[in-house]
Amino acid sequence: MTKNFYCLLLGGALLGSCTVQLAGVPNQTPAQVQATYRVTKDVAYGTDKEQTLDMYLSPTANRLKQKNYTIVFLHGGGYYVSDKAREERYIQPYLKKGMNVVNMNYRIKRGVPLATEDLTYALNFLRANNAAYHLDLNRVIVTGFSAGAHIASLVAVTANDPAYSPKLASGIKIAGVVNFSGPVDGLDVVEKVFMSNDVLVMKAIGVALFPETTDYAPKEYIRKYEPITYFDKNDPPFFIWQGGKDDQVPPVTFEKFVALLQQNPQKNEVLFVPEGQHSPSAAELATAYQAIFEFLDKKVK
C-alpha cells in the first residue's frame, strides 16, 4: 500500500470514531485529492452554453457524517466576466477536507436578474439527477466571491419566500451561506461605482448590471435583487468576509445587513478585514477558511 492510502485510512478511522469537526479533519495533499476525487467537468444544467458546472465527488464524503455538506460555489466578475476555472482557489480548502463540491458557471453579460436565476436552476438539476451523484442536498452550503456571493446570498434568503421565482425543488435545503465580498444591500451604490469608472470594462459592467434600464436603475427595481430585502430570522446562517478597503462593493453597503447578522452572533459570523481589498490575499484567504470551518462546525446545523 502507498503512503497516501495509509493516510486516507487513518483519516477515515478518525472520522468514524467521533463527532466530526471539519476544523480538525486532516487536509488531504494535492496528490491525494487528485487520486481520490471523481471529477466531471462542464456538466450542462441548462440549455445555454454558459449553464455548466464541474462536479467534484469524494468517495469519503459520507465519513463526514453530519458535516457532509454539498458545497456549491459561484465565481465573481461583475456578472460580466470570469469563469469557474479562474477561481478554483476558493474550492481547494473544501476538496482538502474530502467534501463534495460543485463549481458552477452562470450566464454573464446579460444582467443581474438573469444571472441570479441560474443557481436555482443548477440546484434543481442536481436534485433531479441525484441518483447519479448521491449528494446530500439537505445540507447545501452556497458560496461565492463577489457577484457569485451575491447570487448565493439572494437564493438563500428567498428560498423560504413563497412569492419568489424561480423556486427551489423540494428536497433541497440551503444549510448555510459563505459570502466573500458579495453585495447584500446597496446595489445602487455598486452600480454607480462601476458606471462612473473610467476603465472601459468596469463601466461596461455597470451598464450591463440592469439591461432593462437605460440609465441608473430605480431603487424600487434594484431592491428586488438585494438580499437584505428578504432577510428574516428563518434564513440560514451567514458567514461574510468583508474588506475594509473594497473599492468595488464599498463597506457602506454591508452595514445594515451586518447589523442584522450580528443580532444573532450564535448563528452568524462576520470577518471584517480593515485593510482588505475586494479580493482577499492568499494569507487572508487561509485565515478566512480557518474561520469558515469553525463556522460550519459550530453554527451550521
Where are these regions (language model features)?
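Short amphipathic alpha-helix adjacent to the substrate-entry channel of hydrolases
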Residues: 83-102
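Short beta-strand/loop motif that positions the catalytic acidic residue
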Residues: 234, 239-242, 246
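Primarily recognizes the serine-hydrolase "nucleophile elbow" in alpha/beta-hydrolase
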Residues: 124, 128-194
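Catalytic histidine-centered segment of alpha/beta-hydrolase-like enzymes
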Residues: 276-286
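Conserved alpha/beta-hydrolase "acid-adjacent" motif
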Residues: 247-256
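N-terminal cap/lid segment of alpha/beta-hydrolase-fold proteins
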Residues: 22-64
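Mobile cap/lid helix-loop segments that gate and shape the active-site cleft of serine hydrolases
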Residues: 32, 48, 190-229
